[in-house]
């Protein structure tokens, strides 16, 4: 293998929105924050959970809503 071409791996802490934390190795050097992990994902828990995407849709509509309305009028 060639030397000096591979990124350095660091041990980072991954924090989920449910409060679960775990350590992993990554090329990132900062802690990582995620929305869903294996402790709270419906596939692993067997419980249904609604993931809030309304905030993203509202943000998109605020940003591009007027532009899309102008295109529809023309």
Curated annotation (Swiss-Prot):
Pfam families: Ribosomal_L31. Disulfide bonds: none annotated. GO terms for molecular function: metal ion binding; rRNA binding; structural constituent of ribosome. Gene3D superfamilies: Ribosomal protein L31. It comes from the Bacteria. Zn(2+) binds at residues 16, 18, 37, 40. InterPro entries: Ribosomal_bL28/bL31-like_sf (IPR034704), Ribosomal_bL31 (IPR002150), Ribosomal_bL31_A (IPR027491), Ribosomal_bL31_sf (IPR042105). GO terms for biological process: translation. Binds the 23S rRNA. HAMAP family: Ribosomal_bL31_1. This is Large ribosomal subunit protein bL31. It comes from Nitrosomonas europaea (strain ATCC 19718 / CIP 103999 / KCTC 2705 / NBRC 14298). The lineage of its organism: Bacteria, Pseudomonadati, Pseudomonadota, Betaproteobacteria, Nitrosomonadales.
């Amino acid at each position: 293998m060639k030397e000096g071409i591979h990124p350095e791996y660091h041990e980072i802490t991954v924090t989920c929105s449910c409060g679960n934390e775990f350590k992993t190795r990554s090329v990132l050097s900062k802690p990582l924050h995620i929305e869903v992990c294996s402790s709270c994902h419906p596939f692993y828990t067997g419980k249904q959970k609604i993931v809030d995407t309304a905030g993203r849709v509202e943000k998109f509509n605020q940003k591009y809503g007027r532009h899309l309305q102008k295109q529809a009028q023309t």
